[in-house]
Each structure stands twice: as C-alpha cells, then as structure tokens.
Amino acid sequence: ETLHCAHYQALNPVVSEGMVQMAMGTPAALYNGGLLQTHLFYFDPHRQRPGLPEHVAALVDRASNDSVRVHLVNTNPVEAVPVVLQAGAFGEHRFGEALFDANGLSQQVAVDGRHLRVDLGPAVSLVIELSLTRYAHRPSYGRPPQ
C-alpha cells in the first residue's frame, strides 16, 4: 500500500502546521516524525519547559537566511512575563544582534549566542529583528541556562 506524505494529517484531528509556521517562522516537519528545522524556538523560564509562556503570543512575519523578525505580545495586563528565544530548534544557529522596537522606540543589543531572554512588561507588544548565523553551533537538546 502506498501512502501519501500527508496521510497522517487525515488521522490526526489536531493540525499544528499553521501555528508552527506563524510562531517559529518555518514550515512544519515534512513527514510524521521528521525533525523540525526552525529559525526560532521558545522556552518558558518560569515553568522551565519548552514553548511560549502563558499569556505570550508570537508571530514571525519575516524570515531570511540571515535574519528573522518576530512580534511578541504579553496579553497579561498586570504581570510581566519572561520568554527565552533560542536560535533554531536545537540551538544550532547563533543570534548576532537584536533590534528591539516598542511603540516607535528602538534599541539595538549585541547577543552573540544561542539564547535571548526577553522580559515583556504587562500588556506590552514588541518587535524584535534578529540577525542570524545559521548552523553556527552543534545541534543540542540542551536547555537555556537559568
């Protein structure tokens, strides 16, 4: 029996491709069990787990070979929320510089590493343009330092 590459999508009622593409700036894994190749990956430092923290939304609206732009929003009107951005699903990429833009105010920061911690204030919307060197590090399942 020959199966189409989208065969497993018909069996699974949860389709996450759209969310993966919007939040991480990449198409979803090509087949069931394939490795995810992303520009960005997120960690929740409070819960010490992969993924976006509660009340945080992310949208990648531009991605290229050497940069990625992401919009981060903290929907919590009362509390600040930290989020850690990782360069690549396995930390295989390296961030060079980050250009932060919040309400027209810009700030450039040198990162030069796999991880960037961002503390989002209450009800804050932020745009970050990150320069990216692809495949600068050996891929790893390691987590960001606490």
Protein language model annotation of sequence segments:
Residues 61-63, 73, 86-88, 101, ...:
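A structural detector for beta-sheet-dominated domains
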Residues 1-69, 75-77, 128:
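Catalytic domains of carbohydrate-active enzymes that cleave complex glycans
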Residues 82-86, 98, 141-145:
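Composition- and surface-driven signal marking solvent-exposed, interaction-prone regions
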Residues 90-93, 123:
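C-terminal, active-site-flanking charged/polar segments
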Residues 112-146:
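C-terminal beta-strand-rich structural cap/linker in extracellular carbohydrate-active enzymes
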Residues 76-91:
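Surface-exposed beta-strand/loop patches in extracellular or lumenal glycoproteins
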Residues 95-116:
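Solvent-exposed beta-strand/loop surfaces of large extracellular or lumenal domains
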